């Protein structure tokens, strides 16, 4: 059986076949093949070095020594670790000193001021100017209301029978003016809100778009270590805080100061320094108490925000991994995790509410004391004859007129502090450094040689203490089918990530058709590369959308042609909704094999010059895999594309022009399938181990028969010479 299995004919292209040498069993073949190498799970946690070190070493890549590279990479990697730690703490809402917090708050307010008065945007400036004019008009009318009220009261303090008048003849004009003034103030205020609405919404849109755009520019490491639920919740709170901050800056802080100044001036001019002194003292005491108490309350709000982020993270994580929760019956565990986060939020929210009650009580006590003192002075003036009853009413009205902006200012300050806290995370996201950057003089990638890829003395590691690639050098010839094999954690997928510039090398350089990838534009580089990754990323949308994502301007016919080449068109057509069928969150409504074929069709639609298949057919059955690979091989041969296959199952890649064997981050072997078998090294050991395992599999005979039938069909269809 073993000899028969080893001699089974396999295909390479429709007209080319090879026979494998017999796979003789050896003692402990797996451990012998790996040479005791420990299988390691790829764990991406830290960010690689920036471009500086790589650029410095480009010219001397071939002569770089391991000792110098270790010394050079250490500071960079330490800096990267610190940056990663900062990223992890991004949503922690840690408490900072008041001085630092005020500095951060002012920075946010300065940033938001740019959206209030943007350069060159005269439409926004006109709206802000109009809103401010309406604001001033509304405040002036508000201050006039007590004057009319005083006149009405004083004019009514007569003997109507003696003068023979009516309310209209005595105070009619004042009553009309009173009503008109209040209506005018309200009209100006509402018109102001309508005029300013587009300014606030436009600012929210710009900030949210900038943050989203920046998140898409951040490196892979940030997105691998992010907390999706907490991140989205922080962004949501931050965008809501923008509207309040802009409104408070224009309509609350400035107008309240204006109204207080007007009232103090009127009281001083009309009633003397005592009234103005009480008013000024009240303002100072009220403001000082509000600021001090709110600063004390800030830590409770930060604790609540952090707990809210944790709760959102737990909820989203559990729902995304719904199947895993069900597989292991861990519903109660997930509910307990979520409840723990909710309990932390509950405790923090109780502190926020109780501290708010203390703040409101103190504010009310200060204002009520001032009101009582001013009413006493006014009543004393009426008793001595220096003031009229209308003056008493006017003082009362003016003080109450102040109560509205004062109480509003207190609540505004509280909400402003909360908005600033909510926006802090939003703006901190924009400050996260983009480590993978283009050079100012970067040029588009030009594929003049067909897409040759060359790694020269490349050293790279996600952790300083564990390099993944160590001085690796190899060339992927243009237009050839190339494979990379090796044990888990040896750097197979890392090669793709480095070529795609998810990370930059720490030593050495990577060339595509003789061009250092750090010297070309990122967009042109990534446009030339197509990838089918291990975990197929799909959007919660239709099958058609997920295929067309490879090239958004593709026609319906082009989408279906790509699906046919990926052997999924017939399956899609049998679905009730066809190409309009939704795939669900992360494609969970379709099988793993269907997801992989969708990913392949998306890649074929993109039609790049360089193609990477990272375990692209691992979820397919043998027959479907062979039929699909025949199609892919014919496309690669027809268009002369450079292709790289990363695989653990050697039967899927033995027909490649060259096979690279990685071990411990270094190139261990390189050659064709037959050359590597003749070498009798690591590849031969792996091949022997897998063939032995297949021969002992009860399903092997059936699969071998399918392979033979497929090979026979292809041979029959092959052109005869």
Swiss-Prot record:
Its main location: mitochondrion. The gene is atm1. This is Iron-sulfur clusters transporter atm1, mitochondrial. ATP binds at residues 462, 486-497. Glutathione binds at residues 297-301, 360-363, 410. Residues 41-96, 694-721 are annotated as: Disordered. The keyword Transit peptide applies. It is found in: Mitochondrion inner membrane. One of its GO terms (biological process) is intracellular iron ion homeostasis. It comes from Emericella nidulans (strain FGSC A4 / ATCC 38163 / CBS 112.46 / NRRL 194 / M139). SUPFAM superfamilies: ABC transporter transmembrane region, P-loop containing nucleoside triphosphate hydrolases. Residues 453-689 form the ABC transporter domain. InterPro entries: AAA+_ATPase (IPR003593), ABC1_TM_dom (IPR011527), ABC1_TM_sf (IPR036640), ABC_transporter-like_ATP-bd (IPR003439), ABC_transporter-like_CS (IPR017871), P-loop_NTPase (IPR027417), Type_1_exporter (IPR039421). It is a multi-pass membrane protein.
């Amino acid at each position: 059986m073993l000899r028969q299995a080893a001699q089974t004919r396999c295909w390479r292209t429709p007209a080319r076949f090879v026979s494998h040498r017999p796979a003789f069993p050896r003692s402990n073949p797996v451990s012998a093949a790996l040479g005791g190498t420990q299988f390691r799970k790829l764990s991406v946690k830290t960010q690689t070095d920036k471009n500086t070190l790589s650029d410095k070493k480009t010219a001397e890549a071939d002569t770089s020594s391991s000792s110098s590279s270790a010394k050079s990479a250490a500071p960079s990697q330490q800096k990267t670790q610190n940056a990663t730690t900062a990223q992890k703490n991004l949503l922690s809402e840690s408490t900072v000193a008041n001085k630092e917090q005020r500095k951060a708050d002012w920075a946010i307010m300065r940033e938001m001021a740019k959206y209030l008065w943007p350069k060159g945007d005269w439409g926004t400036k006109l709206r802000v100017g109009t809103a401010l004019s309406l604001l001033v008009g509304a405040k002036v009318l508000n201050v006039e209301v007590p004057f009319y009220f005083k006149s009405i009261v004083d004019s009514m303090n007569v003997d109507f029978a003696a003068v023979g008048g009516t309310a209209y003849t005595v105070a009619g004009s004042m009553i009309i003016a009173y009503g008109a003034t209040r209506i005018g103030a309200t009209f100006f205020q509402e018109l102001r809100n309508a005029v300013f609405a587009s300014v606030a919404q436009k600012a929210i849109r710009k900030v949210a778009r900038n943050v989203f755009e920046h998140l898409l520019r951040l490196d892979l490491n940030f997105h691998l270590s992010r907390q999706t639920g907490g991140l989205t919740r922080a962004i949501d709170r931050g965008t809501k805080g923008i509207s309040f901050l802009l409104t408070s800056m224009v309509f609350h802080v400035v107008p309240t100061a204006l109204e207080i100044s007007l009232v103090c001036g009127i009281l001083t001019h009309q009633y003397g320094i005592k009234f103005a002194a009480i008013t000024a003292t009240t303002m100072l005491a009220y403001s000082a108490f509000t600021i001090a108490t709110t600063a004390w309350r800030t830590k409770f709000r930060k604790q609540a925000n952090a707990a809210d982020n944790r709760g959102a993270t737990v909820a989203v994580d559990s729902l995304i991994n719904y199947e895993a929760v069900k597989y292991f019956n861990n519903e109660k565990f997930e509910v307990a995790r979520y409840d723990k986060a909710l309990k932390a939020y509950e405790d923090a929210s109780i502190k926020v509410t109780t501290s708010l009650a203390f703040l409101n009580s103190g504010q009310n006590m200060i204002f009520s004391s001032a009101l009582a003192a001013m009413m006493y002075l006014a009543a004393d003036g009426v008793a001595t004859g220096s003031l009229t009853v209308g003056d008493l009413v006017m003082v009362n009205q003016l003080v109450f007129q102040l109560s509205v902006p004062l109480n509003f200012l207190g609540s505004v300050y509280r909400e402003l502090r909360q908005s600033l806290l909510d926006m802090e995370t939003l703006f901190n996201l924009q400050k996260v450094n983009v480590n993978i950057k283009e050079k100012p003089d970067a040029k588009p990638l030009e594929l003049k040689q067909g897409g040759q890829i060359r790694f020269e003395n490349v050293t790279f590691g996600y952790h300083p203490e564990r390099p993944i690639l160590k001085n690796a050098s190899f060339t992927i010839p243009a237009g050839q089918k190339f494979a990379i094999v090796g044990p888990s954690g040896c750097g197979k997928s890392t090669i793709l990530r480095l070529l795609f510039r998810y990370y930059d090398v720490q030593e050495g350089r990577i060339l595509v058709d003789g061009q250092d990838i750090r010297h070309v534009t990122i967009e042109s580089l990534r446009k030339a590369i197509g990838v089918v990754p291990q975990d197929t990323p799909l959007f919660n949308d239709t099958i058609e959308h997920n295929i067309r994502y490879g090239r958004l301007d593709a026609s319906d016919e082009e989408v279906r042609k790509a699906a046919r080449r990926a052997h999924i068109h017939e399956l899609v057509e049998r679905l009730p909704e066809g190409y309009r069928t939704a795939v669900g969150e992360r494609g969970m409504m379709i099988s793993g094999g269907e997801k992989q074929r969708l990913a392949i069709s998306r890649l074929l639609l993109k039609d790049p010059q360089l193609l990477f298949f990272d375990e692209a057919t691992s979820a397919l059955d043998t027959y479907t895999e062979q039929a699909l690979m025949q199609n892919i091989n014919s496309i690669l041969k027809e268009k002369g594309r450079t292709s790289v296959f990363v695989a653990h199952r050697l039967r899927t890649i033995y027909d490649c022009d060259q096979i690279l064997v990685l071990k411990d981050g270094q190139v261990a072997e390189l050659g064709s399938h037959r050359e590597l078998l003749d070498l009798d090294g690591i590849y031969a050991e792996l091949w022997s181990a897998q063939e032995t395992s297949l021969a002992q599999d009860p399903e092997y005979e059936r699969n071998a028969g399918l392979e033979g039938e497929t090979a026979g069909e292809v041979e029959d269809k092959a052109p005869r010479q």
